[in-house]
């Protein structure tokens, strides 16, 4: 017997980082008791939520462009005698709440990343056409206390937020102003959520935080992220653990040791450095040097020789000279990355870097980004190609585009394509890699090659 259709339809569009993906999932959880079922069609939605990112100017402007399109859908539904509520959530909502309401009056409510547990009440206020329609409080403990441990089924992998906010105050970054200071969830609450996920068939969790390795939500010895990883590794059925995003200053010896000692912790580390020039790192207020970053990488590789390293880079930071950029390229060559994210510096209002002299011309930023990305893509292709001939344990997640094909993830987070029966979804299966491209691996089940 099929389940009844949901009484109301919810469309969520997510911009930005994995934490926003997690937040969007939890918003759907919060709204499910009100009768909202998720739809992929915004034109059919009774409630549209745009979960926004404020890291770069382009991402912010995308939100306003999207709101113009959603407004037209709202007007079309009104003409048909149907309603639509528009909500803007996330970091743009936190930073520009009043501006959003001014620029786009069709928006019914604005909710910051620490207040989305208030969505049911905000929606009720919007429907009553009275009361405050903007919630942007910094109270992450209240948010998580209000969220149920149980979550909707997510598949065989899931994100799990363990830490929010940032105290580092990099001069280019808006996170301390949109997400607040560093705050860690209690380990008991995280474990309860992880156990509930495992009971629903989740085999892999990625622990999320703006500075996830600053986690300190447990009491006593082993209170940091390493202790949390060891605790979660004991959960039956939870076979893989990852974490992101980390700061070099918080990569302590205990966490590095966990990479050697905890088999469930995958051999993959995303450790942003942003630049290879100490002069630029000082201007960014990163509080580490290129050399200290390289020392951390060396220690991690001693602990786990096969670990895949990922990172973030910003080119064209104010005052960046050619020599500074060359230092970044040299650091990339020394590390040898498996994958990376790289961006042109984006001037964000209210951040110290926005007022710095020496703003770099757009064409210079673009030229440097192309040079950096060419080197990073070369390294990524080399890392993937080096997997050919190896047998890797692959967690199959979903069907592929071709008949009989499944897509999974290697321990190094690469997408792996192989022909396999659907019954293997959710299973960790040995796959012999036949080839590695820039973005994925292709292989065959090891049983077929035996």
From Swiss-Prot:
Q: Which Gene3D superfamilies match?
A: Methylthiotransferase, N-terminal domain, tm_1862 like domain
From the Swiss-Prot or TrEMBL record, state where the protein is found.
Answer: Cytoplasm
Locate the MTTase N-terminal domain: which residues?
Answer: 8-128
Q: Name the principal localization, coarsely classed.
A: cytoplasm
Instruction: Classify the source by domain of life.
Output: Bacteria
GO MF terms, alphabetically ordered: 4 iron, 4 sulfur cluster binding; metal ion binding; N6-isopentenyladenosine methylthiotransferase activity
Known PROSITE patterns for this protein? Answer: MTTASE_N, MTTASE_RADICAL, RADICAL_SAM, TRAM
Cofactor requirements of the protein: [4Fe-4S] cluster
**Residue stretches making up the Radical SAM core domain:** 152-382
- EC number, UniProt record: 2.8.4.3
Q: Does the keyword 4Fe-4S apply?
A: yes
InterPro entries assigned: Elp3/MiaA/NifB-like_rSAM, Methylthiotransferase, Methylthiotransferase_CS, Methylthiotransferase_N, Methylthiotransferase_N_sf, MiaB_methiolase, rSAM, rSAM_horseshoe
* Cofactor note as given: Binds 2 [4Fe-4S] clusters. One cluster is coordinated with 3 cysteines and an exchangeable S-adenosyl-L-methionine.
Residues engaged in binding [4Fe-4S] cluster 1: 17, 53, 91
User: In this protein, which residues make up the domain named TRAM?
Assistant: 385-447
Q: Name one GO cellular component term.
A: cytosol
Q: What does the sequence similarity comment in the record state about its family?
A: Belongs to the methylthiotransferase family. MiaB subfamily.
- Which function does this protein serve? Catalyzes the methylthiolation of N6-(dimethylallyl)adenosine (i(6)A), leading to the formation of 2-methylthio-N6-(dimethylallyl)adenosine (ms(2)i(6)A) at position 37 in tRNAs that read codons beginning with uridine.
Q: Show the PANTHER family listed in the entry.
A: CDK5 REGULATORY SUBUNIT-ASSOCIATED PROTEIN 1, MITOCHONDRIAL TRNA METHYLTHIOTRANSFERASE CDK5RAP1
Tell me how this protein assembles: Monomer.
Indicate what this protein is called per its UniProt record.
tRNA-2-methylthio-N(6)-dimethylallyladenosine synthase
| Gene source species | Phenylobacterium zucineum (strain HLK1)
Q: What is the lineage of its organism?
A: Bacteria, Pseudomonadati, Pseudomonadota, Alphaproteobacteria, Caulobacterales
